[in-house]
Amino acid sequence: MLAGVPASTPGSAAPRIGLYRTPHWERIDAPSRDALLARLRRLERHGARVAEVPDLPALHPLYQDQRDIMNHQAARALLHEYRQHREQLSPALRAALEAGQACSPDALRAAWQRTRRARRAYAELWADYDLIVTPAALGAAPAGIASSGDSLLNRNWSLLGVPALSLPNGADPRGLPLAMQLAGSHGGDAALLGWARWIEAAA
């Protein structure tokens, strides 16, 4: 969007959607899972073809690898702030920076090697799907403003370097908002935005 690239306009054909449950499916709360599956059933009634994405073991390490790489990069970027103003940083930020400082060069190289393997495995999916649908979070948005929630289910897409976005998907019994997440192929930003528009219009 910052580049000014318009969303693609899907043709008359409905999308081929891959449901990716992630290795963390059992940790996702019931309202989020139920809302996602119900939305997919509605999309099927509008012509979408939904199929399960097979488990991709190459993607499993990315959830932790992304955190390690991000913490390491943050530790380098905020080295001055850590050294000179450590007491003014939040406990969570200090912990992240210290974890990044402790990450060894060998561990980082291994994380990047796993990332490259995962990117190759992910690229092989796109003969069968137009987009991936997956949970956006483990549950509803947290109440209040103390936290923006757990980023766990976004990390793999960030490290894969592929477009991902979230769409509103109802509310839990407390009235807190739920979301579904869409992911695309590498470089497929415009196509993913176009399919997001189709989903919002269809159901």
Where are these predicted regions, by residue range?
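Structural helix-boundary/capping segments
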Residues: 1-23, 39-42, 46, 109, ...
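Short helix-loop capping/hinge segments that flank enzyme active sites or metal/cofactor-binding pockets
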Residues: 14-16, 68-119, 123, 168-179
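A generic structural signal for short coil/turn motifs at secondary-structure boundaries
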Residues: 25-30, 108-109, 141-144
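Short glycine/threonine-rich loop-to-helix capping motif typified by GTGT followed
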Residues: 30-32, 61-72, 143-148
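Acyltransferase
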Residues: 31-54, 79-84, 108, 112-129
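Short connector loops at secondary-structure junctions
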Residues: 49-66, 97-98, 172
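Short, surface-exposed loop/helix-turn segments at secondary-structure junctions
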Residues: 136-155
